[in-house]
Structure formats: structure tokens, C-alpha cells
């Protein structure tokens, strides 16, 4: 049995690298959701005019890890209090967003945000949006960290987030 989750929180390379290491996750696909344009390209998304968010689609086994646990990881590995940015990545395409795929996921997302809000210094600004169509990103964006670990962005941005995840969530590591 497999379920899917779609979340965005900054550059999709970061979330992809993290969720690829989670026990019970079968596949992580970088892509775009929440778009007003069909079949957007990376270049179009980067303009900030498509309403797309850079996201990852996580295919997981709910008997091994559930949706709520995935959201707890999501909120721990990015800053959900930053509006339309993560670090130096600025624009609506980098917004903190959850795209629930059904009403149950929507209710869980609302519950998790309400539960975690008091633990952050600033208010969580993560939005819950209708995903519309999920568009898979170009092939050169897939499995990015694993194929480019020495690239500057990977070393400076992704590696520290990955280390934080591995320290905080050892019980969820594959």
C-alpha cells in the first residue's frame, strides 16, 4: 500500500535529499504544484509569475510512517515562519506550503500547524493549498543532492539540513 504527500519549503533539492532517507518512503519526486500555468518549466517557475511552488511528492508506506510523522519532519527541516523564502531562496515559489491530497490530510495538516505553532518564536506561515496538478520537475533536478554532493549549494545549504534531520530523527532513518 502506498500514499502520497506533497509539500514545499524552499528549494526542492533540500526536501528531496531529506525525505529520500526516511524509512517507509519509496520515492521522492521534485516538482511543481499550485500552478496556474500548465506544464511549467523551471525557468518559468523562477520568474515568480506562475504561482507554482517548488515541492516534493513523497510516496510512502503508511504502515511504516504516517502522514503526520512526515509533516513533523517537514516542519523541523525548514523554517515555516518565513514568508515566501527559505534563507537566500526568495520568491513565492519557495513558500512553505502543504498540498493535501484529500480531506484527511488537510485535517491532519491543520492539526499539526496548530499543535506546533506555540513552539516557534514567530507564527507559522505555512499555507494549506489545493495542489491542482503535480508537475514533475526536469530530470536534472531529480536526485540532485545524491548526484551532486560536492556542488556549492549542496555543501552550504543541503548538507547542514540533512545533518540536522539525521540527528533529530534517527528513528526514521532508512
UniProtKB/Swiss-Prot annotation:
It is an enzyme of class 1 (oxidoreductase). It catalyses: L-methionyl-[protein] + [thioredoxin]-disulfide + H2O = L-methionyl-(S)-S-oxide-[protein] + [thioredoxin]-dithiol; [thioredoxin]-disulfide + L-methionine + H2O = L-methionine (S)-S-oxide + [thioredoxin]-dithiol. Its EC number is 1.8.4.11. GO terms for biological process: protein modification process. Keywords: Oxidoreductase. It holds the Pfam family PMSR. Gene3D superfamilies: Peptide methionine sulphoxide reductase MsrA. GO terms for molecular function: L-methionine:thioredoxin-disulfide S-oxidoreductase activity; peptide-methionine (S)-S-oxide reductase activity. Disulfide bonds: none annotated. Has an important function as a repair enzyme for proteins that have been inactivated by oxidation. Catalyzes the reversible oxidation-reduction of methionine sulfoxide in proteins to methionine. PANTHER family: PEPTIDE METHIONINE SULFOXIDE REDUCTASE, PEPTIDE METHIONINE SULFOXIDE REDUCTASE MSRA 2. NCBIfam families: msrA. Belongs to the MsrA Met sulfoxide reductase family. This is Peptide methionine sulfoxide reductase MsrA. The gene is msrA.
